[in-house]
């Protein structure tokens, strides 16, 4: 098993997309990259904690390659936007990757370069020290599945899920 920690806007969207992929064993929403010891959602939303909303994606590389996990990441958010994704604005919504070791850091650098080759514009995605991971509150875990009628999810997460299902169809879980 391999674990990546990725931040790219609201963690509800990242969580929703990665849960659709075969080989993804777990997705945990949380906070990372800040200076507050025990961050809460309300505190992180202020932008004052330094933490990013992120997901911890645990996956089986024999089922889904690491490069695909990373290409999905760059498909489901706009890595050219600094400290925002759509209407979500602040450093808590930054595009960032948190490698566990030098091998992951190189995978992340290669993925940023691939994304840059495909985009009209340069990714602003940062590679940041791993630091301490903080699980988000329980109600944020698998939020999209638990709240299918929620307006934000319908407006923002559904199009991202559909885009990834189309672009990475061979890796989508069978229904």
Curated annotation (Swiss-Prot):
Pfam families: PMSR (PF01625). It is an enzyme of class 1 (oxidoreductase). Keywords: Oxidoreductase. The keyword Cell wall biogenesis/degradation does not apply. The active site is at residue 10. InterPro entries: Met_Sox_Rdtase_MsrA_dom (IPR002569), Met_Sox_Rdtase_MsrA_sf (IPR036509). Its EC number is 1.8.4.11. The keyword Ligase does not apply. GO terms for molecular function: L-methionine:thioredoxin-disulfide S-oxidoreductase activity; peptide-methionine (S)-S-oxide reductase activity. It catalyses: L-methionyl-[protein] + [thioredoxin]-disulfide + H2O = L-methionyl-(S)-S-oxide-[protein] + [thioredoxin]-dithiol; [thioredoxin]-disulfide + L-methionine + H2O = L-methionine (S)-S-oxide + [thioredoxin]-dithiol. SUPFAM superfamilies: Peptide methionine sulfoxide reductase. Has an important function as a repair enzyme for proteins that have been inactivated by oxidation. Catalyzes the reversible oxidation-reduction of methionine sulfoxide in proteins to methionine. PANTHER family: PEPTIDE METHIONINE SULFOXIDE REDUCTASE, PEPTIDE METHIONINE SULFOXIDE REDUCTASE MSRA 2. Belongs to the MsrA Met sulfoxide reductase family. This is Peptide methionine sulfoxide reductase MsrA. The lineage of its organism: Bacteria, Bacillati, Actinomycetota, Actinomycetes, Micrococcales.
């Amino acid at each position: 098993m391999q674990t990546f920690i990725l931040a790219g806007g609201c963690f509800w969207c990242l969580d929703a997309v990665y849960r659709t992929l075969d080989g993804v064993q777990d997705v945990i929403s949380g906070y990372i990259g800040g200076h507050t010891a025990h961050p809460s959602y309300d505190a992180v939303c202020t932008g004052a904690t330094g933490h990013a909303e992120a997901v911890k994606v645990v996956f089986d590389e024999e089922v889904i390659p690491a490069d695909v996990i990373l290409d999905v990441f760059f498909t489901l958010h706009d890595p050219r936007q600094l400290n925002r994704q759509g209407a979500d604005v602040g450093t808590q919504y930054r595009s960032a990757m948190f490698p566990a070791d030098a091998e992951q850091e190189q995978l992340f650098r290669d993925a940023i370069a691939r994304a840059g080759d495909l985009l009209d514009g340069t990714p602003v995605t940062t590679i940041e020290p791993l630091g301490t991971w903080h699980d988000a509150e329980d109600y944020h875990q698998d939020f999209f599945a638990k709240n299918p009628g929620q307006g934000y999810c319908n407006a923002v997460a559904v199009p991202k899920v559909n885009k990834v299902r189309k672009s990475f169809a061979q890796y989508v879980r069978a229904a």
